[in-house]
Amino acid sequence: MTDIDYKLEAVPATRIAADDIDKTFRSSTIDLISGALGGKVLGFSDEWFAEAANLLTPTAPIRQPGKMVYTGAWYDGWETRRHNPAEFDWVVIRLGVASGTVEGVEIDTAFFNGNHAPAISVEGCFSQNDDEVLSWKGERGGWETILGVQECGPSQRFGWKLENPTKKQYTHVRLNMYPDGGIARFRLFGHAVPVFPDNTDAIFDLAAAQNGGVAISCSDQHFGTKDNLILPGRGKDMGDGWETARSRTKGHVDWTIIRLGAPGYIQNFMVDTAHFRGNYPQQVKLQAIEWKSEGEPGADSEGWTEVVEPIKCGPDQEHPVESLVKDKPFTHVKLIIVPDGGVKRLRVFAKRAV
């Protein structure tokens, strides 16, 4: 689209195929605006047909053919009126973390066909004042380009990886939709930039996504994804935890590896099986490693240290356990479940190793 008066910087970005979006971003970044993480829609130009807040829903869009509401057909996404007199509709979102740097963007137009967004762009800013950000509405204000104008199509996932991840941190983003239409989901992949306590003896959850933790790999995530382990709160049901398939092999275990937000001296853990009542693991083990090599550690890398005695699990409860190794810094934690099952959250309470 070349006939847009509101000019944006041409930020170099590579289009990612729909089937490659998850493997490109999900093992190294988090969705900075996920509703599960605390991302919040602060304002929008219009949401006549479907609410802008749906953009941040962590689960995939759904369709309910034939379902009608006051405004027309029901859609699981954000949809605005036709015939927008402005160049674009917009929605302003506050990140679910204190601030973050950005590596990529996903726009999903699932089930929007004939009413999908023809094109989008993404802008960001750093501000501690929500009201100031909202006052810019659809104007330039203090917005900076994260992703320039990109064309979209009907009912599919679109991904873009920035050639150079942003060095600047952002607290808010604005999604612009040209000129109007519908988008089901918006993901902003990147890294949380946490605000750590000044007191180096402070103990806090270094696995939490808000504190820079990332779930980098796992053996299986058939029913619930590994990323859920490091979300805030205790969730709402079995669907927002990590759950693996039933195993049929003797001696089987499942595992997931979490990179801590900073190297730390681990003091204790909390393993939470909230909502898992007939499918919790029989036992949980925890290992940690100080990884100094390139890339990320694998499940079989040398150097993993047992940091707790095996934990016998129960249904729908928190399991606090003290670390056996408090004087050694670690960068990653491996949660091992025996033989399989579901865990809602893993907390790793530690002092930063500075």
Swiss-Prot record:
As its record notes, the protein acts as a catalyst of: allantoate + H2O = (S)-ureidoglycolate + urea
Tree of life domain: Eukaryota
| Keyword Hydrolase annotated | yes
Return the broad EC class: hydrolase
Signal sequence span is none
**Enzyme Commission number(s) from the entry:** 3.5.3.4
Please report a single Pfam family linked to this protein: Allantoicase
Give the keywords, sorted: Hydrolase, Purine metabolism
Could you identify this protein by its name?
Allantoicase
State the PANTHER family in the record.
ALLANTOICASE, INACTIVE ALLANTOICASE-RELATED
